[in-house]
From Swiss-Prot:
NRP synthetases are composed of discrete domains (adenylation (A), thiolation (T) or peptidyl carrier protein (PCP) and condensation (C) domains) which when grouped together are referred to as a single module. Each module is responsible for the recognition (via the A domain) and incorporation of a single amino acid into the growing peptide product. Thus, an NRP synthetase is generally composed of one or more modules and can terminate in a thioesterase domain (TE) that releases the newly synthesized peptide from the enzyme. Keywords: Ligase, Multifunctional enzyme, Phosphopantetheine, Phosphoprotein. It is an enzyme of class 6 (ligase). Residues 600-675, 1169-1242, 1237-1313 form the Carrier domain. This is Nonribosomal peptide synthetase 6. It comes from the Eukaryota. GO terms for biological process: amino acid activation for nonribosomal peptide biosynthetic process; secondary metabolite biosynthetic process. CDD domains: A_NRPS_SidN3_like, CT_NRPS-like, FUM14_C_NRPS-like. Residues 1354-1677 are annotated as: Condensation 2. SUPFAM superfamilies: Acetyl-CoA synthetase-like (SSF56801), ACP-like (SSF47336), CoA-dependent acyltransferases (SSF52777). Disruption phenotype: Leads to increased sensitivity to oxidative stress and reduces the virulence toward rice plants.
């Protein structure tokens, strides 16, 4: 640590200490990593920001040409050009370019070999105002073509030699070859004939060039740089580098790299000479070319600079190095001969962002000073957080040199070009923050700790690799190696996968610079080291172990004759990895022997491990103490075996120990003898949780198992696998139960039964049952007596039948056995039955080996039992695995192979195919066969499904966990994980397979999370876990490993061979396709079990042929690219196209054509109409979606819209001049349909109405169309009923939904004759009926606060309204709501008050006061009411929010008597001009549907715009009381006949009844078609109650709008129409989940017409329930409506809303509240209950989530029971 850094850290320490002394409770998380002093220093380095230069570089070149026209500007191999000539030629060419095309945003590719004409072409394009893209003809044609296609080239400049290539890569472009003869004969005469015009000035904001770099997808990324961005960096950069008028600058860099732009433009702008050698000399005789051209300044990579002759360096004024890290030894060596400059800069921020113009000034290399920019270092995972000085962070560049982003790639641009990170806006104590655009480089850098602010390069983020779980920075290794080796040594560290399999290995490739000696004349890439160099390597290795962790020390040093280089002259790391793949483990040992000092194993542990290595790896025990396990041929499987072998010798090792300490000596230090603690048993009941004591656990589990408590030996949690298997057993009852029969001699069978009895005593897993403990989940219960023996008999068939009918589920035995005597025979049938929850393919042989030992009188003692594995699982932090899988599966494609025939289809394997893939040993010895199979299958799936993102499941042994003796544990540990593979056909096969291997290794610590838990992590995880293909790899065991004797009777229950074991695994197939591969020495057998409805047998046969072909291609051509082998023959291609989902467009990376023609392209590609644009804007706002996520082809229903959202849409649309109805919204098939929306006697009338309210032409409505097919929903039906009644047709909402066609609806409609007498339901006082005289205005008037108020109407309050009145008058006043309307800008206070009073005048419920007369609560409507309106000033210096809330608290505590106004306004004015209007209202006057209308009215009244009209609430009351309730009583009587209220009441006592809630969101994006979102929570809740309470008939409450009862204009009623109504679900045994959804939806539709009755009215009039006992629902489902958060108030005034309920509502029931999220893609569920029951609620919410999963496509067709 430097002195400067130490002072900073000391200050930081003092600051932290001072804070903690003042506040010992100060959270550690609140401390910043960067101290205030450090932050000031960082800002001082970056302030002021260097200015933007607003001119173009070609202007500077023109100035030089005017001053020195005869001076040589370009001295090239193909001729020279003066400044006057380049000015003249570029002017003429620029004019020609403008004549050909003067449109804006032109991009012109430039394709030249090294030539004097390249600079002319570039200057001409600059002057013409176009943008250039430089290309190198040495690059592959495919890449050139990709670039040309991206820029949409219309004009293409090339040299004469490259014109043919240009025409090939750009066949549609105009090719203009450039040469001297072209200028003389064509360009000059042509421009002379044109009018004499001058070139217009070019804006500095115009794009100057596009620099293409490699893209991660294989498609080049084009970064756009403008003139000013380039100039702002080039001018200060050139001054620092050393461009002078006398300079002769080498034009070395390939035209594919942006350094060549600096070489051209900086040279010419400074009046220097550009020296351009031919490509041939540039690559093969650089020193000679520089010598001949008298070069004084050159820029190149350090790798190239090392090849220069010494005299060249002596004659250079400066050499600029970049593109790679510069070693201090190189800098010191070259610095003695010339000035060494180090440059750094990504293409995205022009050519160079920093320049170190004196690299020899320090004993280490820095990147130098900022040029045209500011530099920041942030945490690599969070660009908002700066890192301290000296710490490594990601480099961020800010300033005028930051480019515009990537061409046609907004997502990548957004990812790395960021705006206003938090640290930039925040600033520091001495420097104010600022806005800025920043580029994230991905480079890891640290600031020089000496305090001058210069950065030091560490490496690339993506050059960080992981080896055996440890992150390794290759650059750090190289840096530390270079320090201890001769300065001219070339080296590169890499992680390779040696030939012959095994783990990845860290090695170093080195080139020793020998002055004499033979070159590699034989073509061998490998070199040799001199004795002196070997000695240096040995010394270096010792120092590496001091400087670095052991896992960062290379396992071998590979000598090369020559370091492979890319065209950019950087080290070719891909080639190094290829060389590494050709090296065997024996080669590595040979390379190492030359430099390693063989250290004999001396310690006792080293000697023990030496023999264990020999046992596991084979061969003699001659390993030295510094030998590396993985270099010697070890891999993960052998590591597992080493752990087991060590355990046999009483040595404790874990797989991670081996991975991280691979040398014999390091491993020996890590190994330790088995301790007493490790051999002790895990105490019984030690893993059940502290809140569940052993006695309670024993009693509860015994009750659930139906046994005595004394019989319970232990209880511990289930594994995720067991949980999943038990859950799946409910779905596929027999799928995970195996029944096996062995026919044996009677004596043998009886002895075998005794052996089983003995083995069961010593094998707890066989005595294990699984139970579901309420509120706790699934647990394993180990019984002392498992009660496993079944009665004997003499009829085997009958025994097997009874055995199959005996369930294996919760609380029952999961393993059982019995004997059946064969009649008239000395044979007996021994039958065992076992559930997969207690065994797997690994543990089954262990169990039967246990039995065999007992059969032979031997005792078996397992070192570890299943509960040791459980202990390990419970010790893990699930958050780590959750984070891994969530990130791993982010963005997963929903398209998997094979596709299902239709949504909701339940797969059932019915076909089996076998195919043998022959793999010669010589071929697959270089690669892991398991990895090859995974990679090949991913490619096969991708080819067939037409998508590059593939997911399939793989079942693993699960025995990689660090549990001693895990290989001997009797119990199921297999685990299934989703394998995700993203393919790019540009990727080499070897690299692709290495990627797959790396992923499988990385997932090992997280493989036991469980599919059911992974799928809950996110929507993407759920998609990924809906697996269609399952893969099982059965490796062939070594003869000495895992061999089970076949001579004992228990082995008759084992599969006779690997093939039979594979077939056994196929019996448990629940996938559409399951592949079991049995791996052998010379190949593998594939057994495919599949559902022929998903893929035909013929097609599957061809799929296996494709798999075979790709495996062979992988083995035979590992250097090829995936695209070279990704080929289907015509028959295979037809299969693929036939089964490919129609919404999949084949990824361009897969090289396939689109599945459908252009006509299938989404309408989102079309330009939106004005109406579509308006509607998309409204939908985005009310559904909470990004507008860009809403396509014209999306329907409101698909986007997650509901009736409330539809009403908001209609209201907002009308405000924008679009006349829509709610019914039209639901009817529309798409946004386009809705935007384009504009009928025989009764049918004709209805068609006319439908045409109007659904917005479609009458001619488009057919008699056979049903309302539901036309898109209707409850609100739309309500409008149809209302409008039909106005036309004299009487229909109900139920009739609308029940009618299958328009014709049927018309036939059910009754015509109302005008002569029929009608009751005036709008008459005042009519709702009081015969009691009107008892509650006259004169009588009621005495109860009013003001006797002068004029009464216009009186009505009886509705039941919920009455409760709300009581909740306003009495304490606690839970029905009072305070809406805070916040104005940030000044408002017209007088106008606001007028608007508030006018609001009351317009809405009768606001001028309604409530009185109590003879125990009847009445609503009294006043003709006029001036409600309280006050203004309060917030005192200066007061916290406004606290002051307002104190005022609200004071207000709610004040009396609110009957007869007074519940409505009041208080305007709080703030000293800064802001204000807050507090609006008080009672729930007796509103519900959540009408309140947004009220605020729209208030906004309109204030701004003077059109005010939306509302319907008086008293009209609704009249309609309900006089018309609807009489009709509703028979309906509710019929629905609730024979029912009773369902009670979900835990046994936990309630003490203070405080409310508590929990909330989770669930993915519902795959909900079934034609099922409304509102049906989902209701159906899910019904399922939860049914399952939890074991009921088939449930009744609970549901909150409804109360607006579907047929009243006219129901959507505009202002008042509390909402109701709680009963919902009943009488389950049928034959129901599927879809049947349930349809039943729920049908009941919603039917009951909508009768939803105005209150609960108390229904109980009293429609049921035989006890009114005293059933006063309220026990559980209620409520779908919450959307809410207004902000609203414009006109004249630039914006209002934000905040809601306060100072007094919480007393909780009376369980509430299940649903919230539609993300436009209907997610459903939020909140469970509200009492605090004491919140633990129970967590289980309830979990069950709701599981129920919702069953209601989604893919499962909805399954049977419930």
């Amino acid at each position: 640590m430097s002195r400067h850094q130490a002072v900073l850290q000391l200050h930081f320490f003092a600051s932290i200490l001072e804070t903690l002394l003042k506040d010992v409770n100060h959270p550690l998380s609140h401390f910043d990593k960067v101290s205030e002093d450090e932050l000031d220093e960082l800002w001082s380095w970056n302030t002021p920001l260097q200015p933007e230069l607003r001119f173009c570089m070609h202007e500077k070149v023109s100035e030089r040409a005017a001053l020195h026209p005869e001076k040589i500007a370009i001295d090239a191999w193909d001729g020279t050009l003066t400044y006057g000539q380049i000015e003249d030629y570029s002017d003429k060419l620029a004019k020609l370019l403008r004549l050909l095309d003067d449109s804006s945003n032109r991009i012109i590719p430039v394709l030249f070999e090294k030539s004097r004409w390249t600079s002319v072409a570039v200057l001409a394009i600059m002057k013409s105002g176009a943008c250039f893209a430089l290309l190198d003809p040495a690059q592959p044609e495919g890449r050139l073509r990709a670039v040309v296609q991206q820029v949409n080239a219309k004009i293409f400049l090339s040299s004469k030699a490259q014109s043919t290539l240009a025409a090939r890569v750009a066949p549609a472009a105009t090719i203009i070859p450039i040469s001297k003869s072209k200028f003389n004969k064509i360009f000059s005469p042509y421009t002379a004939e044109q009018p004499n015009t001058t070139l217009p000035p070019v804006s500095p904001d115009q794009p100057l060039y596009i620099q293409f770099t490699s893209g991660s997808t294989g498609v080049p990324k084009g970064c756009i740089l403008t003139h000013s961005q380039y100039t702002s960096g080039a001018i200060p950069r050139a001054a620092a580098v050393g461009y002078y008028p006398h300079s002769r600058v080498l034009d070395f860099a390939s035209y594919a790299f942006d350094v060549c732009i600096d070489s051209m433009l900086c040279t010419l702008a400074h009046g220097a000479t550009l020296c351009t050698p031919s490509d041939e000399r540039r690559m093969n005789d650089m020193s000679g070319a520089m010598r001949d051209m008298r070069v004084t300044f050159a820029g190149m990579t350090p790798s190239v600079a090392r090849t220069l002759d010494v005299d060249i360096l002596n004659n250079l004024e400066s050499i600029a190095l970049g593109g790679e890290g510069v070693s201090i030894s190189d800098a010191m060596s070259w610095g003695q001969r010339t000035r060494v400059v180090n440059a750094y800069g990504p293409s995205e921020a022009t050519v160079g962002a920093t320049i170190n113009d004196n690299v020899a000034a320090k004993p280490y290399i820095t990147m130098g000073q900022r040029k045209g920019c500011a530099l920041w270092l942030t945490e690599p995972e969070d660009h908002n957080k700066l890192v301290p000085v000296g710490a490594v962070g990601e480099l961020l560049i800010e300033g005028p040199i930051v480019g515009n982003g990537y061409l046609n790639n907004p997502s990548k641009t957004k990812e790395v070009f960021i705006e206003d990170p938090e640290f930039l806006i925040k600033g520091s104590k001495s420097y104010p923050g600022r806005h800025g655009r920043i580029y994230k480089t991905g480079d890891l850098v640290r600031f020089d700790p000496d305090g001058d602010g210069e950065p030091i390069f560490v490496g690339r983020q993506d050059q960080q690799v992981k080896l055996r779980g440890q992150r390794i920075e290759l650059a750090e290794i190289e840096f530390n190696m270079q320090k201890h080796l001769p300065p001219d040594t070339q080296l590169a560290a890499e992680v390779i996968k040696p030939s012959g399999g095994g783990e990845q290995t860290l090695v170093a490739f080195l080139v020793e610079q020998k002055k004499n000696g033979m070159r590699h004349l034989d073509g061998n890439v490998f070199g040799s080291f001199t004795n002196k160099f070997q000695s240096a390597l040995r010394d270096m290795t010792k120092q590496l172990f001091v400087d670095l962790p052991s896992y960062m020390v290379p396992s071998a040093y590979i000598p090369l004759w020559k370091m492979p280089l890319l065209v950019s002259c950087k080290t070719d790391r891909k080639r190094l990895r290829e060389i590494g793949a050709s090296v065997t483990r024996q080669d590595l040992r040979r390379f190492n022997s030359a430099v390693s000092e063989k250290k004999e194993a001396t310690t006792e542990m080293e000697l023990k491990l030496q023999s264990l290595w020999a046992k596991v790896l084979g061969g003699d025990a001659d390993f030295s103490a510094n030998d590396n396990f993985f270099s010697m041929g070890g891999d993960s499987l052998r590591a597992m075996r080493l752990v087991a072998a060590a355990r046999d010798e009483a040595i404790v090792l874990s797989v991670p120990d081996i991975m991280l300490n691979p040398t014999l000596s390091a491993m020996a230090e890590k190994a330790k003898p088995v301790s007493a603690e490790e051999t002790n048993e895990v105490p019984p009941f030690s893993m059940i949780g502290k809140d569940w004591d052993a006695d309670a656990a024993r009693r509860e589990s015994a009750r659930l198992c139906g046994v005595d408590a004394a019989n319970v030996e232990d209880v511990y949690p289930c594994t995720p696998l067991q949980e999943g298997l038990i859950a799946l057993s409910a779905k596929f009852q027999d799928a995970y139960v195996a029944q096996r029969v062995a026919t044996l001699p009677a004596k043998t069978a009886l002895r075998l039964k005794e052996a089983f009895d003995t083995a069961v005593e010593g094998s707890p897993v066989l005595r294990t049952r699984i139970v579901n403990v309420t509120g706790r989940g699934l647990f394993q219960v180990v019984l002392k007596d498992g009660q496993l023996v079944r009665e004997h008999g003499t009829d085997t068939s009958e025994y097997l039948r009874r055995d199959r009918n005996e369930p294996m589920d919760l609380g029952t035995a999961l393993f059982r056995y019995g004997l059946v005597k064969e009649p008239e025979s000395d044979q007996m049938n021994f039958v065992i039955t076992m559930h997969h929850a207690v065994y797997d393919g690994w543990s089954m042989p262990l169990v039967f080996d246990h039995v065999n030992s007992a059969f032979n009188g031997l005792h078996t003692e397992r070192p570890t039992s299943f509960k040791h594995f459980i202990k390990h699982l419970t010790s893990l932090d699930p958050a780590d695995a959750q984070q891994y899988w969530k990130k791993r599966l982010e963005g997963t494609s929903p398209h998997q192979f094979p596709p299902l025939p239709q949504k909701g289809y339940t797969t059932q394997a019915d076909s089996l195919l076998e195919h043998y893939v022959t793999v010669p040993t010589s071929a697959h010895s270089k690669l892991t066969l398991a990895t090859i199979i995974r990679g090949a299958w991913a490619l096969v799936s991708s080819l067939y499904i037409g998508h590059p993102d593939i997911v399939f499941g793989e079942t693993l042994t699960g025995r990689s966990a660090p549990v001693p003796g895990i290989e001997q544990i009797e119990g199921p540990m297999i685990t299934t994980v989703p394998i995700r593979v993203r393919l790019s056909l540009d990727r080499p096969i070897t690299e692709y397979l290495q990627m797959i291997h790396a992923v499988t290794v990385k997932q090992i610590p997280h493989e036991h999370l469980g599919l059911q838990n992974i799928r809950r992590l996110s929507k993407d995880a759920r998609v990924a876990c809906d697996l269609r293909t399952g893969l099982v790899l059965h490796p062939k065991e070594d003869e000495d490993w895992g061999k089970v004797s076949l001579e004992t009777p228990a082995n008759t229950f084992l599969p006779a061979s690997d093939e039979e074991g594979a077939r056994e695994a196929l019996k448990f197939n629940t996938y559409a396709l399951m592949l079991v591969c049995t791996l052998e020495e010379n190949g593998f057998l594939v057994m495919a079990s599949f559902d022929s409805n998903c893929i035909s047998k013929e097609a599957m046969e061809r799929v296996l042929v494709v798999l075979d072909r790709i495996v062979h291609a992988f083995l035979g051509n590992p250097e090829s690219k995936l695209g070279d082998v990704a080929v289907l023959d015509p028959a295979e291609a037809r299969d693929a196209e036939a089964m490919r989902p129609r919404d999949v467009m084949s990824d361009s990376a897969l090289g396939m054509s689109p599945v459908d023609g252009l006509e299938s392209m989404d309408a989102s590609l079309k330009e939106l109409s004005p109406n579509e644009e308006k509607l998309r804007n409204i939908l985005g706002r009310i559904l909470g979606m990004k507008e860009t996520d809403i396509r014209p082809s999306d329907s409101f229903f698909d986007l997650g819209g509901d009736s409330i959202g539809a009403m908001r849409l209609v209201s907002d649309a009308r405000a924008q001049g679009l006349n829509l109805t709610v019914a039209q919204v639901f009817q529309s098939r798409s946004l386009s349909d809705l935007a384009a929306s504009a009928s025989n006697e009764r049918e004709d009338k209805l068609a006319e109405i439908l045409s109007r309210i659904l917005g479609i032409a009458k001619s488009d409505i057919k008699s056979s169309d049903s309302f539901f097919e036309l898109g209707g929903d409850s609100i739309g039906a309500m409008r149809l009923v209302s409008d039909a009644r106005a036309q004299g047709l009487s229909i109900t909402v139920a009739q609308v939904f029940q009618s299958k066609s328009l014709a049927e609806l018309a036939s059910s409609a009754e015509e109302e004759m005008p002569s029929q007498p009608k009751t005036n339901v709008d008459a005042p006082f009519i709702a009081l009926g015969k009691d009107a005289n008892l509650h006259s205005p004169d009588r009621v008037g005495v109860y009013l606060e003001n006797q002068e108020w004029e009464i216009t109407n009186i009505y009886p309050t509705r039941p919920l309204q009455q409760l709300a009145v009581e909740g306003t008058v009495d304490l606690p006043r839970y029905s009072l709501r305070y809406e805070l309307i916040k104005f940030a800008t000044p408002i017209d206070r007088q106008k606001l008050e007028q608007a508030c009073q006018e609001l009351v005048a317009r809405n009768e419920v606001l001028r309604t006061v409530f009185v109590k007369d003879n125990e009847l609560t009445l609503g009294v409507v006043l003709s006029a009411l001036r409600v309280p309106y006050t203004e309060t000033a917030v005192p200066e210096g007061e916290d406004a929010d606290a002051f307002i809330q104190a005022g609200i608290k004071q207000d709610i505590e004040a009396p609110k008597p009957y007869g007074s106004s519940f409505v009041a306004f208080n305007l709080f004015t703030h000293p800064n001009g802001a204000s807050t209007l507090v609006f008080r209202i009672s729930h007796a006057q509103y519900d959540e549907i009408c309140l947004p209308i009220l605020f729209e009215q208030l906004s309109a009244l204030y701004s003077g715009t059109t005010v939306p009209e509302t319907v008086p609430f008293s009209k609704h009351v009249n309609h309900v009381v006089l018309d609807n309730i009489p009709k509703a009583i028979p309906y509710w009587e019929n629905l609730l006949s024979g029912s009773e209220m369902t009670v979900l009441k835990p046994t936990i006592p309630l003490t203070h009844r405080g409310p508590a809630d929990i909330y989770r969101e669930f993915d519902i994006s795959s909900r079934p078609a034609n099922i409304t979102i509102g049906s989902l929570p209701t159906a899910a809740w019904a399922l939860v109650l049914s399952r939890r309470l074991n009921l088939t008939d449930v009744v609970f409450g549901e909150v409804v709008s109360g607006r579907n009862v047929g009243a006219p204009n129901a959507d505009r009623i202002f008042g509390p129409t909402w109701q709680y109504i009963p919902f009943r679900v009488p389950f049928s045994k034959s129901w599927s989940y879809l049947d349930l959804l349809r039943y729920v939806q049908d009941q919603h539709m039917t009951s909508a017409a009768y939803e105005s009755m209150g609960f108390s009215e229904i109980v009293k009039n429609c049921t035989n329930w006890d009114e005293d006992k059933v006063q309220w629902f026990d559980t209620v489902v409520h779908q919450a409506p959307a809410w207004v958060e902000e609203l414009p108030f006109g004249n630039g005034v914006e209002a934000k809303f905040q809601t306060l309920y100072p007094h919480g509502e007393p909780l009376r029931e369980w509430k299940c509240q649903a919230f539609v999220k993300e436009g209907g893609r997610k459903l939020g569920i909140e469970i509200v209950t009492f605090e004491e029951w919140i633990g129970e609620a967590e289980g309830v919410l979990e069950e709701v989530g599981k129920a919702l999963e069953c209601l989604m496509e893919g499962r909805v067709g399954e049977s419930i029971f």
